[in-house]
Amino acid sequence: MLPPSVTLRPQPLLTDTDLLLYNLIRLAVEDHYLVFARVPLWSVVSVEGDGKVRLQVLRQIALKQLDFVLVHPGTKVAEQVVLLEDGFPPQPHEVSRRQDIQSVLQAAGITLTILKPQTSYTVLQLAQLLGVSEDE
């Protein structure tokens, strides 16, 4: 299957910063959502339509990856997506990626929240940003 000259090794799924944010998000939403990391965009939406158009949309979203997905434990449907925006200002390819993801999520009725990994968040702040705080 693999050419002899190719070597595969496991690699970390999350950076240290991503893992910290993952744990904070998990604590903030633990009574409301399941949290998944590094999820392909195509796996959270159902693309329905005629053959060619459907394939075109699937190709457009095929390699797009979501940083964190919040899934309702009862319906098992993604209700919110968290994207991390590293650079300021964001690079043109990051802006394009975010716009593509944003339009797909909006069409599917999935909420998008953008976080800056270099910002320090508390569990309460994240709960408020993600709409699960007790105050609401």
Role assignments for model-derived ranges:
Residues 1-49:
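N-terminal topogenic membrane-targeting module
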Residues 1-10, 120-136:
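Non-catalytic C-terminal interaction segments of nucleic acid-processing enzymes
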Residues 3-4, 47-48, 54, 83-84, ...:
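Generic signal for short, ordered secondary-structure residues
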Residues 10, 57, 115:
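Generic anion/oxyanion-binding catalytic loop in active/binding sites
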Residues 13, 37-77:
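Active-site metal-binding core of divalent-cation-utilizing nuclease and nuclease-like domains
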Residues 16-19, 23-33, 37, 95-106, ...:
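Intrinsically disordered, low-complexity Ser/Thr/Pro/Gly-rich regulatory segments
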Residues 22-26, 55-62, 80-86:
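Short, mixed-charge, low-aromatic patches
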Residues 69, 73-128:
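Basic, amphipathic alpha-helical patches used to engage nucleic acids or provide basic targeting signals
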